Amino acid sequence: MHLAVYRNANSNLFAALGADCGVDCVGDEISGTALIHMLDAINKNSGMPQTVIYTLNPSNAAQIASIAGAFPNVRCGAAWWFCDHKRGIREEMEITAENSSLGSFLGMLTDSRSFLSYARHDYFRRIAADILGDWVNGGEYDKESAVSLAEKISYYNIKELTEQ
């Protein structure tokens, strides 16, 4: 689920070039209550499928992380679009750790429009290693747990999800 996105903001450019030409924007904050009711209805009626929630509006991140933590099979997605820079990735990971479960985080992603996205994944892993290293150096986390967490969010969590 991509939340808080405003698609095709420039109508002249959309008319000339069509969708996915670079005029999407950060959208308004979403209603946490509406998201909770929707996820609860899905969970009650049919069981919660594997669900990943991405927000393009960083002001929603803590709320969405806490909501994701309240439901089985719901995870926070990586910082995306306007948030996939050093500060955005760091903030998304820290907010997820504080309000949900970083241990189930799926790490960086890409889409079919990306070409040679190794650099994006390498960049993410370097930032993740920096965060985990800060926690270890600050005495907040032990080294073995940090290595295990790095492996999970860089490889094992998505492997497990895609093999289900």
Feature map (PLM): residue ranges:
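Histidine/acidic-residue-rich catalytic or RNA/ligand-binding cores of hydrolases
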Residues: 9-18, 61-70, 86-93, 115-130
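Short acidic/histidine-rich active-site segments
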Residues: 1-4, 52-54, 76-79, 102-120
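Alpha-helix capping and helix-loop boundary segments enriched in small/acidic/polar residues
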Residues: 25-29, 119, 145
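Divalent metal-binding pocket/active-site signature
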Residues: 1-59
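Short acidic (Asp/Glu) and glycine-rich catalytic loops that position anionic groups and cofactors
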Residues: 13-19, 72-75, 105-110, 132-137
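C-terminal helical cap
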Residues: 56-59, 76-95, 142-162
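Mid-to-C-terminal alpha-helical segments outside catalytic/metal-binding sites
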Residues: 103, 120-164
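Glycine-enriched alpha-helix->loop->beta-strand junction motifs that scaffold or abut catalytic
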Residues: 44-48, 70-76
